[in-house]
Amino acid sequence: MANVLKEKMYDELLSATCRILKLGSHDYRITERNLLSKNPKFPLCDIILKLDYAYNLEYLLSLWEHVTKQEPRFVFKNTGGAVSMSCYLHAPVKVEGHHAVRECNILRVNECLTVRMSDIVAMKPSTFAVFTKCIIRRNRDDTYVVEFVAFGPENESEYISLLKAIFLKKCSMGKQHLESNRFCQGLRRRSSHVLEKGRFESSGKVVNKASAVVTSQESIKQFYEKEKSLLSGVKFWRLSERHCRFALVGICFLLALYFCYVLLKKTPTPASGSVV
């Protein structure tokens, strides 16, 4: 079970280191687990650091210390063409150089600088400062500068009072936010109540509109029937007018024939023979 935990710790430290330092596949070299099990004072990994890049060194050291419950050490070495950083879980067997860690450290060829968490804390202006970052810069010739940048207040009490003021401001803003949320909830409830009333009223209006539509349709039908009856009456009147005209013409013709017949009957007819 202990070996499984060690393997998990090994994988966790490597993945966290690559993630925090944003390393590529060609930027580091890993020591095998078998060698670490035989000699735990070997470095877990060796990293080639880039120039003018800010590495979150304190965050990585604090994470290693939290995971391993030990005091890890990061050893910077000038290899001549670059600066490498070897990450140790335990103190290395041979430490090359015993430089005191400062904000700016000059490394000549083959010189080393060992950094622990206590060294970073000692450089910080306050314990509650922002995480310290490490930057590698090229100096004259083949020398490099390992610079540790730490931001923080010089007066601890002022920093604590500032944090308290920020906390109180956030608390007051949180209370205002809660009150505004309650007010908004009340408005939402009122608006929902008004909307429900509006829905009921609108449903009544819809029913009234539907009845009005029905009545309007009935009135349209009645009007159409009336118009239809009127049109039929007009048509009948026109037909009856035509028939009356024909009847009058026929009566006049018959009267003319009768008048002619009477005239012909009254006129005397001449005698057919001579009178003696």
UniProtKB/Swiss-Prot annotation:
Source taxon at top rank: Viruses
Topological domain spans for side Nuclear: 265-276
Positions on the Perinuclear space side per record topology: 1-245
GO cellular component terms listed in the entry, alphabetical order: host cell nuclear inner membrane; membrane
Location relative to the cell: Host nucleus inner membrane
Bilayer topology annotation: Single-pass membrane protein
InterPro entries linked to this entry: Herpesvirus_viron_egress-type
PTM comment: Phosphorylated.
Transmembrane stretches, start-end: 246-264
Disulfide-linked positions: none
Signal peptide feature range: none
Alphabetic keyword roster: Host membrane, Host nucleus, Late protein, Membrane, Phosphoprotein, Transmembrane, Transmembrane helix
Sequence similarity: Belongs to the herpesviridae NEC2 protein family.
Assembly description: Forms a heterohexameric complex with NEC1.
Function: Plays an essential role in virion nuclear egress, the first step of virion release from infected cell. Within the host nucleus, NEC1 interacts with the newly formed capsid through the vertexes and directs it to the inner nuclear membrane by associating with NEC2. Induces the budding of the capsid at the inner nuclear membrane as well as its envelopment into the perinuclear space.
Listed HAMAP family: HSV_NEC2 (MF_04024)
Name the UniProt record assigns to this protein: Nuclear egress protein 2
Organism the protein comes from: Human herpesvirus 6A (strain Uganda-1102) (HHV-6 variant A)
